[in-house]
């Protein structure tokens, strides 16, 4: 297969999004068909690339001597590309009903397609320079998704999102400069890390930590997490879903590439970099859960939940062992499914009823049973209830913590994960219970069915079903992630 196929999932949606401003669709249906066709084609190309190719690579051009724009589809790239393109497709389908009365609908889709292409480039980047270039593009192009409503609150949130993104990117850029100088080249991703970097000076440790912190901004890691709860309540529900479920994972991918494919896990194991990383991750897990527990605005509660849940991933990565690494990658997938389901469910409720508070949702299970059943399944998955997929990832994370060899983390990690799971139950289960069991004094006669159309329901059902299926049969994913772990550890 021609290696130029790597450019298709990147250029197709970017070109389609840019051209969207030139097309005049007389009917919304034709606009939706256009957007869906592009997203479906991108997802299909990513799946075919993952299944039918080994590890194709493509060097486009040199920026400076020894610094190239280079793409390569290794196993990790394929996992992230398939995840992002498929979830992007489902969120796009969901948005057709959510935005059907929005005057800025076409502008939203143009930006949405462009961001999807930039994310594909991010996944397929073959070196740290290429990754960083598209990481910056992603931050800039995704900001209008937050800004979409053009209210005072959305403008403030968009500026905050961009400020935090740029600040994190500058921290990461410092690390890239140092590692590029020490490594003497383009910092191509190599499983296990680059030997040139591992033989470098002590300042390399600080550079690596700056990259963890910088890319961790996008993942919502403390202390640079504040953009998440600001951006989610003001963004349209489809944008909130992908910000939480997908764009945060771009930060996770940056950390994985920097630590496991450039620095090398062995290089930082047992150093202050690992210990501080573990501490920051556990603090964020607990803090995010506490803030979510106290929050009364539904989408903001889910945003704080993302701060906590993505830090489960960061915690697993910080332990630098196979079980924790597998658990972290599993949680990347499973959190994306659950959190997209939750945000889309919340968006459906807001769209149909106008209710935005966590204490306003009594009886919504009677009004919108399919939506709220999907919401409930996703909630149980995030809590970690078997046989849903969240249980599997958290099992591997706890196992990795016990095997970490870090005396405090060995017992403190599972304890904090358990406390966080209880807090997660505390802020999600009451919503589900009041939705289906509002109490004997509730006025059922005033309720009317407000279930959305299949365009909203199909993505919700698909992701909720996957949360069950992958929880019962996780073996295929576990084997794939174990192969990646064996290569980098």
Give the location of each predicted region.
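Cytoplasmic juxtamembrane regions at transmembrane-helix boundaries
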Residues: 97-111, 442-455
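Short phosphate-coordinating micro-motif centered on Lys-Gly-acidic
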Residues: 136
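Hydrophobic transmembrane alpha-helices and their helix-loop junctions in integral membrane proteins
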Residues: 90-100, 106, 116-131, 141-434
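Alpha-helical transmembrane segments
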Residues: 14, 35-43, 85-88, 113-117, ...
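Cytoplasmic/organellar membrane-interface segments at the starts of transmembrane helices
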Residues: 235, 366-371, 421, 428-489
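Hydrophobic alpha-helical membrane-insertion segments
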Residues: 35-48, 165-174, 375-383, 462-475
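Transmembrane helix-loop-helix hairpins at membrane boundaries of multipass inner-membrane proteins
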Residues: 1-8, 15-110, 186, 193, ...
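Alpha-helical transmembrane segments and their helix-start/interface "positive-inside/aromatic belt" motifs
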Residues: 28-39, 156-166, 368-373, 453-462
């Amino acid at each position: 297969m021609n290696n130029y196929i790597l450019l298709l999932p990147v250029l197709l949606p970017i070109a389609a999004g840019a051209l969207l401003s030139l097309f005049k669709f007389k009917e919304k249906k034709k606009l939706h068909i256009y957007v869906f066709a592009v997203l479906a084609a991108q997802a299909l190309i990513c799946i075919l690339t993952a299944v039918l190719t080994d590890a194709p690579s493509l060097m486009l051009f040199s920026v400076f001597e020894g610094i190239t724009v280079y793409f390569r589809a290794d196993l990790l790239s394929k996992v992230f590309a398939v995840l992002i393109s498929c979830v992007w497709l489902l969120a796009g389908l969901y948005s057709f009903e959510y935005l059907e009365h929005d005057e800025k609908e076409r502008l939203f889709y143009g930006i949405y397609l462009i961001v999807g292409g930039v994310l594909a480039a991010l996944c397929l980047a073959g070196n740290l320079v290429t990754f960083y270039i598209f990481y910056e593009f992603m931050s800039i192009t995704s900001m209008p998704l937050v800004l979409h409503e053009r209210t005072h609150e959305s403008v403030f949130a968009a500026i905050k999102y961009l400020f935090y993104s740029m600040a994190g990117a500058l921290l990461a850029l410092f690390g890239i400069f140092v590692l590029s100088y020490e490594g003497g080249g383009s910092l191509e991703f190599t499983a296990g890390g680059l030997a040139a970097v591992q033989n470098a000076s002590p300042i390399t440790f600080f550079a690596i930590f700056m990259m963890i912190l910088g890319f961790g901004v996008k993942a919502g890691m403390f202390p640079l997490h504040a953009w998440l709860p600001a951006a989610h309540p003001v963004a349209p529900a489809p944008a909130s879903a992908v910000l939480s479920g997908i764009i945060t994972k771009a930060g996770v991918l940056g950390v994985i590439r920097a630590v496991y494919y450039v620095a090398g896990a062995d290089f930082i194991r047992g150093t202050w970099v690992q210990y501080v990383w573990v501490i920051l991750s556990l603090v964020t897990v607990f803090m995010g859960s506490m803030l979510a527990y106290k929050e009364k605005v539904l989408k903001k509660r889910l945003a704080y939940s993302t701060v906590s849940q993505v830090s489960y991933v960061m915690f697993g990565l910080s332990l630098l062992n196979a079980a924790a690494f597998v658990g972290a990658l599993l949680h990347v997938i499973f959190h994306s499914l659950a959190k997209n389901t939750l945000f889309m469910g919340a968006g459906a409720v807001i769209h149909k009823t106008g209710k935005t508070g966590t204490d306003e949702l009594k009886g919504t299970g009677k009004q919108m049973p399919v939506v709220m059943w999907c919401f409930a399944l996703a909630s149980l998955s995030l809590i970690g209830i078997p046989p849903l997929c969240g249980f599997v990832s958290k099992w591997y994370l706890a196992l990795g913590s016990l095997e970490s060899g870090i005396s405090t983390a060995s017992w403190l990690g599972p304890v904090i994960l358990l406390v966080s799971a209880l807090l997660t139950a505390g802020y999600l289960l009451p919503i589900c219970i009041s939705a289906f069991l509002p109490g004997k004094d509730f006025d059922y006669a005033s309720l009317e069915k407000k279930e959305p159309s299949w365009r909203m329901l199909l993505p919700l059902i698909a992701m909720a079903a996957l949360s069950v299926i992958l929880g019962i049969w996780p073996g295929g994913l576990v084997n794939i992630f174990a192969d990646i772990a064996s290569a980098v550890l």
